[in-house]
C-alpha cells in the first residue's frame, strides 16, 4: 500500500498551503521490518494499538455553517447513536478535539476563523468536509463563498450530499476510522521521523461504479 508522507516545513512562508511538503512513499514499517525484524514487528504492534485507541475515541469539534449541521446533529440522537463509534463527546474547545467537521457553506469571511480554530487543535487531528457546499462550494459559485474547504484546510474525508443524511456522515466517520487505523505516526514527539504517513484510501465513488451501473430499478426515496 502506498502512503502520503507529509512533513512540516518551518521555513515555508505563512501564506503557503500546505505549510510543508508531500511525497508518495511505501509503508515505512515494511522498511523497518527489513532492517530489524524484532523492532519492526514491535513497532507494528505498538502502532496498531495506538491507532486502535485513536480511531475508537474520536472527539469532534463541530463547526456548523448551514443546513448540513442539522443533519450532523441528528447523528447524535438515539436512532443513529454515534456513541457506537466513540465520537459522541462534542468538545467546546478545539484544543480538546481530535477532528473537526465542517458542515455547510463556508464564506470567505469565515475561512480565517476556521483556519485559526484548526491551528488550535493538537496533533493528531483530522478534518471531515460534510456537504456539497463544504466540498466544492455547492450551488454557490459566487464571489463570497469558498469553493471547497480544502482550499485552506487538509481534508481527510469528503461526505457528499445536499444535505447528506446522518447515515452518510456516519459512513464518513467509519472511513476516517479506517484511515486512522492504517496511519503511521511517530510514537514519540522527540524520537524518530516526525513525518505523518497517511494511507492512500480508494475512492468510494470508484469502488462502487460497477455496482451503480448495474442498477436498473430506481426506487423512490421513500422506499430506500
Curated annotation (Swiss-Prot):
Using the UniProt annotation, give all residue ranges assigned to the region (Disordered). 1-20, 201-224
Q: Which UniProt keywords apply?
A: 4Fe-4S, Cell inner membrane, Cell membrane, Iron, Iron-sulfur, Membrane, Metal-binding, NAD, Quinone, Translocase, Transport, Ubiquinone
Annotated catalysed reactions: a quinone + NADH + 5 H(+)(in) = a quinol + NAD(+) + 4 H(+)(out)
The positions annotated for binding [4Fe-4S] cluster are 67-68, 133, 162
Membrane topology recorded in Swiss-Prot or TrEMBL: Peripheral membrane protein
- Which coarse location class describes where this protein primarily resides? membrane
Q: Where is the composition biased (Basic and acidic residues)?
A: 203-212
What does the record note about the cofactor? Binds 1 [4Fe-4S] cluster.
Q: Where is the composition biased (Polar residues)?
A: 213-224
- Documented EC number(s): 7.1.1.-
Q: What is the top-level taxon of the source organism?
A: Bacteria
**Listed GO CC annotations:** plasma membrane; respiratory chain complex I
Entry-linked Pfam families: Oxidored_q6
The record's section on InterPro entries has:
NADH_UbQ_OxRdtase-like_20kDa, NADH_UQ_OxRdtase_20Kd_su
Q: Which cofactor does it need?
A: [4Fe-4S] cluster
**Localization (cell):** Cell inner membrane
Q: Could you tell me one molecular function GO term of this UniProt entry? A: NADH:ubiquinone reductase (non-electrogenic) activity
Q: What does this protein do?
A: NDH-1 shuttles electrons from NADH, via FMN and iron-sulfur (Fe-S) centers, to quinones in the respiratory chain. The immediate electron acceptor for the enzyme in this species is believed to be ubiquinone. Couples the redox reaction to proton translocation (for every two electrons transferred, four hydrogen ions are translocated across the cytoplasmic membrane), and thus conserves the redox energy in a proton gradient.
Quaternary structure and partners: NDH-1 is composed of 13 different subunits. Subunits NuoB, CD, E, F, and G constitute the peripheral sector of the complex.
> Could you say which protein family the record assigns here?
Belongs to the complex I 20 kDa subunit family.
Name-wise, this protein is: NADH-quinone oxidoreductase subunit B
Species assigned in the record: Pseudomonas fluorescens (strain ATCC BAA-477 / NRRL B-23932 / Pf-5)
Q: What is the lineage of its organism?
A: Bacteria, Pseudomonadati, Pseudomonadota, Gammaproteobacteria, Pseudomonadales
Amino acid at each position: 500500500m502506498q502512503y502520503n508522507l507529509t512533513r512540516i516545513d518551518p521555513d515555508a512562508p505563512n501564506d503557503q498551503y500546505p505549510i510543508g511538503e508531500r511525497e508518495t512513499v511505501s509503508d515505512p514499517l515494511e522498511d523497518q521490518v527489513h532492517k530489524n525484524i524484532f523492532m519492526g514487528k514491535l513497532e507494528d504492534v505498538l502502532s496498531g494499538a495506538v491507532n486502535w485507541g485513536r480511531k475508537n475515541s474520536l472527539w469532534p469539534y463541530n463547526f456548523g455553517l448551514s443546513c448540513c449541521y442539522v443533519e450532523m446533529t441528528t447523528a447524535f440522537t438515539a436512532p443513529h447513536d454515534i456513541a457506537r463509534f466513540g465520537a459522541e463527546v462534542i468538545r467546546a474547545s478545539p484544543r480538546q478535539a481530535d477532528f473537526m467537521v465542517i458542515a455547510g457553506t463556508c464564506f470567505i469571511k469565515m475561512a480565517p476563523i476556521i483556519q485559526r480554530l484548526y491551528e488550535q487543535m493538537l496533533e493528531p487531528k483530522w478534518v471531515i468536509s460534510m456537504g456539497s457546499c463544504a466540498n466544492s462550494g455547492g450551488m454557490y459559485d459566487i464571489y463570497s463563498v469558498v469553493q471547497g474547504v480544502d482550499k485552506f484546510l487538509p481534508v481527510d474525508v469528503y461526505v457528499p450530499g445536499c444535505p447528506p443524511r446522518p447515515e452518510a456522515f456516519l459512513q464518513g466517520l467509519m472511513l476516517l476510522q479506517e484511515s486512522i487505523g492504517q496511519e503511521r505516526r511517530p510514537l514519540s514527539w522527540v524520537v524518530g521521523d516526525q513525518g505523518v504517513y497517511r494511507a492512500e484510501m480508494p475512492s468510494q465513488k470508484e469502488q462502487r461504479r460497477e455496482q451503480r451501473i448495474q442498477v436498473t430499478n430506481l426506487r423512490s426515496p421513500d422506499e430506500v
